[in-house]
């Protein structure tokens, strides 16, 4: 039995609240159960130096956690003067994941900044950030199209992400903190709307996992991401 009482293949209650803030071209509050992340997509003219003159855009991401998003307060990384390794790893993952869904030529020489700020953490903050940032990105592209700054939609498809793991020898979907902290295997999976894999991150926390368990976890993730993408489509009115 899972601590939450969910079935092994059941997502937490999921929501995408669009236009959550007024200034960003795209903003979404995404909630996976008690994990809540504010995702914004900001558009700026210009690209990094290595892309200047190439007629294509860029997308990058930043990730942070509010000091009291967790059970005990964590100091701000800005106060310490540098980002931690976990933060750098997660924001690179978010950027990689969403770049896979963008036609950079259609974007022109513009940069999209995705900012993912964790308001409340209960496991799965990186996967929630990816799923929420994708919806914010769609709204930013809609802004560019409606203001006639671009002619063609740069989005090649939606992207969803979810965690899976072995909890008490059972494959489970969308781990919360109670499960994640006691999981024998933890895996994060990112996929496109078309069913392609963008990222698979998996590691054994205790005993090694088998090929059969790995296949079961990936199937669980694939089905869960299908549900997440349907929820994104509903939120977007597609």
UniProtKB/Swiss-Prot annotation:
SUPFAM superfamilies: Ribonuclease PH domain 2-like, Ribosomal protein S5 domain 2-like. InterPro entries: ExoRNase_PH_dom1 (IPR001247), ExoRNase_PH_dom2 (IPR015847), ExoRNase_PH_dom2_sf (IPR036345), PNPase/RNase_PH_dom_sf (IPR027408), Ribosomal_Su5_D2-typ_SF (IPR020568), RNase_PH (IPR050080), RNase_PH_bac-type (IPR002381), RNase_PH_CS (IPR018336). One of its GO terms (molecular function) is tRNA binding. One of its GO terms (biological process) is tRNA processing. Its EC number is 2.7.7.56. Phosphate binds at residues 86, 124-126. It is an enzyme of class 2 (transferase). Keywords: Nucleotidyltransferase, RNA-binding, rRNA processing, Transferase, tRNA processing, tRNA-binding. Gene3D superfamilies: GHMP Kinase, N-terminal domain (3.30.230.70). It catalyses: tRNA(n+1) + phosphate = tRNA(n) + a ribonucleoside 5'-diphosphate. PANTHER family: EXOSOME COMPLEX COMPONENT (PTHR11953), EXOSOME COMPLEX COMPONENT RRP41 (PTHR11953:SF0). Belongs to the RNase PH family. Phosphorolytic 3'-5' exoribonuclease that plays an important role in tRNA 3'-end maturation. Removes nucleotide residues following the 3'-CCA terminus of tRNAs; can also add nucleotides to the ends of RNA molecules by using nucleoside diphosphates as substrates, but this may not be physiologically important. Probably plays a role in initiation of 16S rRNA degradation (leading to ribosome degradation) during starvation. Homohexameric ring arranged as a trimer of dimers. This is Ribonuclease PH. It comes from Alcanivorax borkumensis (strain ATCC 700651 / DSM 11573 / NCIMB 13689 / SK2).
């Amino acid at each position: 039995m899972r601590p939450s009482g969910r079935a092994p293949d059941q997502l937490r209650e999921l929501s995408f609240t669009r236009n959550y803030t007024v200034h960003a071209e795209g903003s979404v509050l995404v909630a996976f159960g008690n994990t809540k992340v504010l995702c914004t997509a900001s558009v700026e003219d210009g690209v990094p130096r290595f892309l200047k003159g190439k007629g294509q855009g860029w997308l990058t991401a930043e990730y942070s956690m509010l000091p009291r998003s967790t059970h005990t307060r964590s100091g701000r990384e800005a106060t310490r003067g540098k980002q931690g390794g976990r933060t750098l790893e997660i924001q690179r993952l978010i950027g990689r994941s969403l770049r896979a869904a963008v036609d950079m030529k259609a974007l022109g020489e513009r940069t999209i900044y995705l900012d993912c700020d964790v308001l409340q953490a209960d496991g799965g903050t990186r996967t929630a950030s990816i799923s929420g940032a994708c919806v914010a990105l769609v709204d930013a592209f809609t802004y560019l199209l409606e203001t006639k700054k671009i002619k063609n939609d740069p989005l090649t498809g939606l992207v969803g992400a979810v965690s899976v793991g072995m909890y008490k020898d059972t494959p489970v979907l969308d781990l919360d903190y109670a499960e994640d902290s006691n999981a024998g295997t933890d895996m994060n999976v990112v996929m496109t709307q078309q069913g392609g894999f963008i990222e698979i991150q998996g590691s054994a926390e205790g005993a090694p996992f088998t090929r059969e368990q790995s296949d079961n976890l990936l199937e669980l993730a694939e089905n869960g991401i299908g549900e997440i993408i349907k929820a994104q489509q509903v939120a977007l009115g597609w």
